[in-house]
Amino acid sequence: MNQMNPAFVMPDVQSTPDTRQIPIQRVGVKAVRHPLTVRTQGGEVQPTVGTWNLDVHLPADQKGTHMSRFVALLEENKAPLEPATFRTMLAAMLEKLEAEAGRIEVSFPYFVNKTAPVSGVQSLLDYEVTLTGETRNGATRLFLRVRVPVTSLCPCSKKISQYGAHNQRSHVTINAELAGDVAVEELIRIAEEEASCELWGLLKRPDEKFVTERAYENPKFVEDLVRDVAQRLNADERIVAYVLEAENFESIHNHSAYAVIERDKRAG
């Protein structure tokens, strides 16, 4: 094996000038799986595994970015994830990469311990969460996305049938741009409270009876579901914009029913 000359300086190719004079809006690393901890609304720290995308703006005169520094940032970040620490992490990335603009996105499973409505038995239910932060033109924006599984029951089916109504599992996905701190649990509760019924990981027979009857007493089309959730988001001043989706995995069709509401409150 060749011995390296102590006087030899390894070239830093990515730091050399680029003559094509074309800026790159986003360059970085994608789909990096790395453990993290998340601070819950109650103050506890929950361990999970995140899938990270990190990128920065690259000026026209710079050949490449420092890819290893993105992963180094993940290794250095030990603070439980919450809006304040996420903003700090974004600022640290821009400093480390010597960039004026950048973006961090992390998706992870988030677990909530839920108590069954009648038996009181406890079980975990998982939710898909994505936190995104981006800095552009000196301004930082923060987005919280939560996908919430719920139950929906068809009002039309209930109206025309003598023996019940078709119901199905649905997904309510809220992607909110935040002006203040909003906990994951808060968005989960909004979606669950506006559905025909929420879900639990473990139910006993009395609980199943409750869930069935609760959904029957609270039928909603997919249009009702998104509008009712939208009313709650509209009333929350900490949320400045949102994209809201609802998808019903129809039990009597081989397709889904789908609805989307988008609103930017800054536009009136």
UniProtKB/Swiss-Prot annotation:
Disulfide bonds: none annotated. The record marks C154 as: May be catalytically important. It holds the Pfam family GCHY-1. It is an enzyme of class 3 (hydrolase). GO terms for biological process: tetrahydrofolate biosynthetic process. Keywords: Hydrolase. HAMAP family: GTP_cyclohydrol_B (MF_01527_B). Converts GTP to 7,8-dihydroneopterin triphosphate. This is GTP cyclohydrolase FolE2. It comes from Paraburkholderia xenovorans (strain LB400). The gene is folE2.
